[in-house]
């Protein structure tokens, strides 16, 4: 997908870039039967109290129902369209199965309109096909990886990401998967994954250019603690541009941050991690 750079007709346009979706997107209106409504809470809970900061506003969106499970085995499907999805960074592909059922999947890199895809243990090792990990050759690039059998893919779903199947673990029940972060993890061999890398890899190269584009996405301004008052943030107060004045930077609630490890060493999933991600010292 090409990247369009705008002329500097204003400060907001200077250095702004965007993706040229017409190069890839073949259908602009979503499939009505695969849409669902979604409400936005602007980061508030049922009591109206803010539980997540920097959320609110943004364009209204309709949720596209994505098939992360891929359990319709041995029924071939044809890719009818590649569509834009405002709810995720990756594009989505509209599939029409041989029995007439329609569904959306995350569009892998290289998948085109007219391609045939299939799921099941006997499916070919081909981009877009979904198989149990035990049926995939070692070294294959995969995405949309399940963590629990039948729950649907949870890992590696963002634009441009991919994982690699490395081999069997000591226990025959598990296989080793290297994630895009560098983490090597044990995953049950009966879990499913989709062949190929997630498409739309140019997404990370886009320069937003102006604050308004992040507001359209439902994100509100992230204010630095050093420009707040002392009663609002531990970094606040002082005359002019004052330093933090503390041994370590703190969060708004007084907890150590910036480099402080937050993952518990007693986490029950720790036993599945063979090697931590790059830069981790846990």
Curated annotation (Swiss-Prot):
InterPro entries: NA-bd_OB-fold (IPR012340), Rib_uL2_dom2 (IPR014722), Ribosomal_uL2 (IPR002171), Ribosomal_uL2_bac/org-type (IPR005880), Ribosomal_uL2_C (IPR022669), Ribosomal_uL2_CS (IPR022671), Ribosomal_uL2_dom3 (IPR014726), Ribosomal_uL2_RNA-bd_dom (IPR022666). Pfam families: Ribosomal_L2 (PF00181), Ribosomal_L2_C (PF03947). The keyword RNA-binding applies. It comes from the Bacteria. Residues 35-44 have a biased composition (Polar residues). Residues 257-266 have a biased composition (Basic residues). Keywords: Ribonucleoprotein, Ribosomal protein, RNA-binding, rRNA-binding. Residues 31-56, 226-282 are annotated as: Disordered. GO terms for biological process: cytoplasmic translation. GO terms for molecular function: rRNA binding; structural constituent of ribosome; transferase activity. GO terms for cellular component: large ribosomal subunit. One of the primary rRNA binding proteins. Required for association of the 30S and 50S subunits to form the 70S ribosome, for tRNA binding and peptide bond formation. It has been suggested to have peptidyltransferase activity; this is somewhat controversial. Makes several contacts with the 16S rRNA in the 70S ribosome. Belongs to the universal ribosomal protein uL2 family. PANTHER family: LARGE RIBOSOMAL SUBUNIT PROTEIN UL2M, RIBOSOMAL PROTEIN L2. Part of the 50S ribosomal subunit. Forms a bridge to the 30S subunit in the 70S ribosome. This is Large ribosomal subunit protein uL2. It comes from Levilactobacillus brevis (strain ATCC 367 / BCRC 12310 / CIP 105137 / JCM 1170 / LMG 11437 / NCIMB 947 / NCTC 947).
């Amino acid at each position: 997908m090409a990247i369009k750079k705008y002329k500097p007709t204003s400060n907001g346009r200077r250095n702004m870039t965007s993706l040229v979706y017409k190069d890839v997107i073949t259908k602009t209106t979503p499939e009505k039967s695969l849409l669902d409504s979604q409400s936005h809470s602007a980061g508030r809970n049922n009591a109206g109290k803010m539980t997540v900061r920097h959320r609110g506003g943004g364009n209204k969106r309709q949720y596209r129902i994505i098939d992360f499970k891929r359990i319709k085995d041995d029924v071939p499907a044809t890719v009818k369209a590649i569509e834009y999805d405002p709810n995720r960074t990756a594009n989505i592909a509209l599939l029409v199965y041989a029995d007439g059922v329609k569904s959306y999947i995350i569009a892998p890199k290289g998948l085109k309109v007219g391609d045939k895809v299939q799921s099941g243990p006997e499916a070919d090792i081909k981009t877009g096909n979904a198989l149990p990990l035990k049926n995939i050759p070692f070294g294959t690039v995969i995405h949309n990886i399940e963590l629990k059998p039948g729950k649907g893919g949870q890992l590696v779903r963002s634009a441009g990401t991919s994982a690699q199947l490395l081999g069997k673990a000591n226990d025959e029940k598990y296989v080793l998967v290297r994630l895009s972060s560098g983490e090597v993890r044990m995953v049950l061999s009966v879990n499913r994954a989709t062949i190929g890398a997630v498409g739309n890899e140019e997404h990370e190269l886009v320069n937003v250019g102006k604050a308004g584009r992040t507001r359209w996405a439902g994100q509100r301004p992230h204010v630095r603690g050093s420009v707040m008052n002392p009663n609002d943030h531990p970094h606040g107060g002082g005359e002019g541009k004052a330093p933090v004045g503390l041994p370590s930077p703190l969060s708004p609630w007084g907890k150590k941050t910036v480099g402080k490890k937050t993952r518990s060493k007693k986490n029950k999933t720790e036993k599945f991690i063979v090697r931590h991600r790059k830069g981790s010292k846990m």
